[in-house]
């Protein structure tokens, strides 16, 4: 499989055996012709599962983005054509390697005494929640407790993250040791050793190239949910999300658009909707205009709701790998209103106290609202809050591929507007002036200027030049721009937290 955000090329250049197959004999690693968008396309079978509607096959289509992988029924596979079978020699090598890895892991098993200590700590954490047991609790308790307590460090010590995704949110989309699927659910793929980077090199790489997760297991993880019914919309997830394993067998899961509770049975979901009394996110409304509202939710006060929001967003963010510890975060949820209530459009989260100066930890616009200008509103709102705080902010890296594009567009448009204003007044402008005016970090300003090739060195001085082409592009985008955040409507003061409110909830 290709990394997130890239186009997948199915199979390798090696010759494969071809032959007939049936729904019962086809296996993982086979390449077959699968119907997609009315055409037969070459696809690799990465996983197989039995659902209530029958056997389904997880297909990675040739030259298609990873997020377009999907579960398909046997009826969409053309079994009249020969399929390409995986190389048997490689299967033997893989089996031998798997056995070797299993034996190595067994030697490094922690002592029974340590396991008991970890289990008791997890029990105390659940008890301190002060809420009824949740299906997610059982799933978390089955995972290694130590790994989940690590605060956003990769193996090379790098702080990262969505996630959308985007993203991938320390404790919400951070690259800590993630909750993995069983080994037999990981597809047969080459796992190359990832190059090691220093902290500065890694941040620079992620800043300029978008969301490319550095964890090979995360890349090869199979999407487990096929379809989601969310309010009036049917959503098709892009990535794996760690809902309880029992939901893997469902053809569709049902999520309440107000409280975000999830159900596998339609009857249970209908019963819940009749009893659910929530009609807006469980927080304070801090902004309202004719189009949207913003709610501020404290992750410590609304743990279950925020955890459910993280599970929902993980389906559309490739790098969001830690979902349980929401206590140190504030969630800002954007909604649209009608007579039924407030419907979630998207959200961003931020740390209650960020040592790195991040004003966004995770940001996502739900797929049904993308390409409508809502992502820009989320970004603008995050910077308006930074202006009220009197700080310079920056989103936590890495951004998802779509998040990176949205931020670059927002940065470039606002920087051009600032520069044109200085030019009209015939005033000198520096990078620091731009950063303060937009509440951006000087590093983000400088990277944007370099990406747009607006920094030049002339007669011994560094100068900022705005090409005529960019000015015309900005004028066109202004004509299309419909919605903006009105800073006068924001009813918000920077919250003050005690040390207890800022800590993790273990």
UniProtKB/Swiss-Prot annotation:
Signal peptide: none annotated. Residues 87-98, 167-178 have a biased composition (Basic and acidic residues). It catalyses: L-lysyl-[histone] + acetyl-CoA = N(6)-acetyl-L-lysyl-[histone] + CoA + H(+); L-lysyl-[protein] + acetyl-CoA = N(6)-acetyl-L-lysyl-[protein] + CoA + H(+); 2-hydroxyisobutanoyl-CoA + L-lysyl-[protein] = N(6)-(2-hydroxyisobutanoyl)-L-lysyl-[protein] + CoA + H(+); (2E)-butenoyl-CoA + L-lysyl-[protein] = N(6)-(2E)-butenoyl-L-lysyl-[protein] + CoA + H(+). The active site is at 396 (proton donor/acceptor). PROSITE patterns: MYST_HAT. It is an enzyme of class 2 (transferase). Its EC number is 2.3.1.48, 2.3.1.-. Residues 220-494 form the MYST-type HAT domain. It is found in: Nucleus; Chromosome. Acetyl-CoA binds at residues 361-365, 370-376, 400. InterPro entries: Acyl_CoA_acyltransferase (IPR016181), Chromo-like_dom_sf (IPR016197), HAT_MYST-type (IPR002717), MYST_HAT (IPR050603), Tudor-knot (IPR025995), WH-like_DNA-bd_sf (IPR036388), Zf-MYST (IPR040706). Component of the NuA4 histone acetyltransferase complex. This is Histone acetyltransferase esa-1.
């Amino acid at each position: 499989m290709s990394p997130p955000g890239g186009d997948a090329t199915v199979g390798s250049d090696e010759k494969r055996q071809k032959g007939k197959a049936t729904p019962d004999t086809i296996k993982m690693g086979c390449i077959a012709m699968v119907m997609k968008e009315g055409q037969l396309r070459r696809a690799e079978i990465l996983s197989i599962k039995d659902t209530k509607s029958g056997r389904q096959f997880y297909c990675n289509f040739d030259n298609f983005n990873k997020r377009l992988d999907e579960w398909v029924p046997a009826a969409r596979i053309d079994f009249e054509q020969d399929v390409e079978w995986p190389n048997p020699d490689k299967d033997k090598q893989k089996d031998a390697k798997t056995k070797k890895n299993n034996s190595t892991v067994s030697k490094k098993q922690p002592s029974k005494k340590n396991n008991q200590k970890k289990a008791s700590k997890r029990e105390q954490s659940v008890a301190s929640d002060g809420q009824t047991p949740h299906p997610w609790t059982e799933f978390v308790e089955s995972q290694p407790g130590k790994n989940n307590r690590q605060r956003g460090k990769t193996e090379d010590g790098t702080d990262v993250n969505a996630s959308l995704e985007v993203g991938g949110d320390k404790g919400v989309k951070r690259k800590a040791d993630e909750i993995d699927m069983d080994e037999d659910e990981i597809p047969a793929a080459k796992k190359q050793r990832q190059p090691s980077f220093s902290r500065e090199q890694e941040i620079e790489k992620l800043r300029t190239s978008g969301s490319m997760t550095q964890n090979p297991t995360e890349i090869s993880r199979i999407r487990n949910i096929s379809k989601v019914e969310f309010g009036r919309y049917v959503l098709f997830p892009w990535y794996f999300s760690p809902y309880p394993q029992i939901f893997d067998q469902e053809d569709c899961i049902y999520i309440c658009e107000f409280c975000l509770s999830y159900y596998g049975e339609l009857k249970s979901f209908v019963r819940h909707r009749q009893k659910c009394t929530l009609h807006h996110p469980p927080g304070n409304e801090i902004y309202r205009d004719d189009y949207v509202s913003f709610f501020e939710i404290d992750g410590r006060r609304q743990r279950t709701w925020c955890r459910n929001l993280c599970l929902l967003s993980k389906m559309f963010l490739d790098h969001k790998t830690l979902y349980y510890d929401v206590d140190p975060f504030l969630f800002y949820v954007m909604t649209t209103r009608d007579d039924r209530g407030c419907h979630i459009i998207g959200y961003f989260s931020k740390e209650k106290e960020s040592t790195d100066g991040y004003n966004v930890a995770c940001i996502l616009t739900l797929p049904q609202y993308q390409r409508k200008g809502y992502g820009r509103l989320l970004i603008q709102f995050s910077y308006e809050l930074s202006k009220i705080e009197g700080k310079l902010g920056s989103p936590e890296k890495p951004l998802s591929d779509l998040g990176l594009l949205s931020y670059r567009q927002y940065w470039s448009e606002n920087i051009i507007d600032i520069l044109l204003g200085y030019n009209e007044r015939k005033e000198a402008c520096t990078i620091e002036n731009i950063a303060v005016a937009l509440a951006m970090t000087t590093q983000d300003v400088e990277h944007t200027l370099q990406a747009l090739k607006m920094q030049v060195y002339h007669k011994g001085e560094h100068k900022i030049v705005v090409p005529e082409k960019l000015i015309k592009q900005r004028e066109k985008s202004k004509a299309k721009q419909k919605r903006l955040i009105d800073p006068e409507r924001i009813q918000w003061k920077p919250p003050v937290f005690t040390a207890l409110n800022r800590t993790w909830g273990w």
